[in-house]
């Protein structure tokens, strides 16, 4: 039986909203459903390079109360002929800082589900943590491992 080679990778992404739809649910104050598209760039930070300079598109839905709650969606990274698509699930937690301003942090897990080019048949997992640096811009640091199914 052949053993799969696993690659440990990590990176940092800076993303900005390019589309956003928010709908007030109306049951309790501050309850919204949200759909965003965010675009940005991936910077590889690990020993093994992964999609350094790749273009990132995140498509995320959320069910938030006072900007805290579950998120899910997809993250797509492309660089030339290579791409990797991951399904993500996680949460946004928004709290007030000591200065009284909202601080939103993101925690998510991603499972790679599809790839092209050198990432065709990609499988693997990622953990990610991020923070908003403005209302519509966020930074995510991630690490994980992948392998290519034969």
Q: Which residues are covered by each model-predicted region?
A:
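Beta-strand-enriched cores of mature, soluble protein domains
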Residues: 1-150
């Amino acid at each position: 039986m052949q053993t799969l080679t696993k690659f440990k990778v990590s990176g940092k992404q800076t993303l900005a909203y390019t589309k956003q739809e928010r709908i007030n649910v109306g049951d309790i104050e501050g309850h919204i459903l949200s759909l965003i598209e965010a675009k940005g760039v991936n910077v590889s930070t690990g020993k093994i390079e992964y999609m350094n300079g790749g273009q990132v598109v995140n498509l995320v839905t959320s069910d938030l109360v006072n900007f805290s709650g579950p998120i899910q969606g997809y993250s797509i990274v492309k660089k030339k002929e290579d791409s990797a698509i991951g399904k993500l699930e996680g949460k946004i937690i928004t709290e007030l800082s000591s200065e009284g301003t909202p601080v939103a942090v993101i925690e998510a897990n991603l499972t790679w589900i599809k790839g092209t080019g050198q990432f065709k048949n990609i499988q693997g997992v990622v953990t990610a943590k991020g923070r908003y640096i403005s209302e519509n811009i966020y930074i995510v640091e991630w690490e994980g491992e992948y392998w290519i199914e034969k």
